[in-house]
Amino acid sequence: MNKRRLTTATLIMACALNISATGIPATGGKEKADKREAVAQTEYKVPVAGAHEAMMQGRFSPTWESLKGYVTPEWFRNAKFGIWAHWGPQCVEGSGDWMAREMYIEGSKAWKHHREHYGHQAEVGFKDILPLFKAENWDPDKLVAYYKSIGAQYFFALGNHHDNFDLWDSKYQPWNSMNIGPHKDILRGWADAARRHGLRFGVSLHADHAWTWYEPSRRYDLKGDRIGEPYDGHLTKADGKGKWWEGYDPQDLYRQNHPLSKGSWSNDICGSQWGWGNGAATPSQEFVNNFYDRTLDVINRYNPDLLYFDVTVLPFYPLSDAGLKIATHFYNHNIATHKGKLEAVLFGKILDEEQRKAMVWDVERGAPNEKVAHPWQSCSCIGGWHYNTSIYERDRYKSAKTVVALLADIVSKNGNLLLSVPLRADGTYDEKEKAILDEFGAWMRTNSEAIYDTRPWEIFGEGPIASSSIKINAQGFNEGEYAKATAEEIRFTQKGRHIYAIALGWPESNKVTIKSLAKGSAYHKGSIRSVELLGYGKLKAHQDSEGLTVCLPQKKAGAIAPVLKIKR
């Protein structure tokens, strides 16, 4: 059939039914189309309007119904493991995550550290830390090559955090890494390195919450000899005359020219307002447009394969359609740059079942205790999200064994693990992180066939943790339970004719009994042809009504978590 005839027929049918792609009665003509768009925008308190960057038209439109046509690409389902460089200027002081907020909360560790080492927050605010972020030893090519060598199949870079500082040559944020600090396009360095080494490239963007997150920068001391002297969050461009930041407007960074959120002086209120409810200050039209423009700038300039938002559902949702329009642009742009095939992956948190059809569900530092129908991701970190010297000094990093346990558990449930490895401000990891990653990489080199390209088995696992009820807290935060895993805990994956049984520890008896593979099991009714230990070879096994019992060798190959390859 002729394409022109098909298009005409489709339009005739739409007119006959008096509908449009948005579900609003079709009336025809540009003026009436604009009216339909205006009607659609009335659903949102702060819709995108007057932005500089145009949303790309294509297969998808900015509605949930349209976006539910998304299908997770096979490359992501096969990849299973990625590394994240959650790295930026908040690493300078070594105070850990949310440092640029915590440094304004009187009495906090970050506040005390900043006051002692850098000065009073009225005179030295976070804006003054930015020039100290030099990235002087940062070698993205060397880092990405190493991440690939330990098993990463995709790589994520931080584009901006809640601190609102852009780590690229940003068109819409003058407070960026080309103008201040490293004087480098960090995203360009990461993107080029990832693609040189054959890794898919992702960007995480978090700055939409700067609006409320930075509110403590407007506080002042309640104790001491400078009570009531405001911190630097109130400053404007006019205040910079004669200072290093002359010509820059601190409000472009802090975004505090608005009424405070309800309960703003409560230090813990920010989390409960993450979904823009519970009294959170409503972002302005200009701020929403600015984040939208910055995000499309990243998509258009760096063409990421993956895009991550640290939000409930999508940026500014449900106040704005900005997130829906960003998702639409991301998918359509990806299709246009991948020969008509959708290869993009977009992440959001706290998604309902319908929203999980439109994008990929991300769980922070945790996992559901069940198999999940749609592919999903858990993001975690071996330490704090931003580099924390206290974690280093107190040996509080996750062990390689814990990382393997998390990976096996997540993959058994149809998920991927995105692991953050904190970098110091100069762009390097420390020797303790290196030792952990080396050990993890050794395990992956022996056992990765039980991870890559696999799919969940009939059940995800067996053992005390598998049979317990572990709830997700908000967006995650239950991974501590999985760090307690022993050899009793087994996780399953499958590929072709093989089942992989990953024991999350080496049994003292040198025997593994897999109850789910007992004779007459509801999960596997056929025979077991052979069993081998990856990295070792074939093993003796006995199957009866109690389970499949396998004798392990004395030599503890892959002692972190032995993997049995079971041919059926």
Language model: regions and residue ranges:
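Bacterial N-terminal signal peptides that target proteins for export
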Residues: 1-10
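N-terminal cationic leader/targeting segments used for protein routing and processing
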Residues: 3-4, 19, 31-33
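Bacterial N-terminal signal peptides
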Residues: 9-20
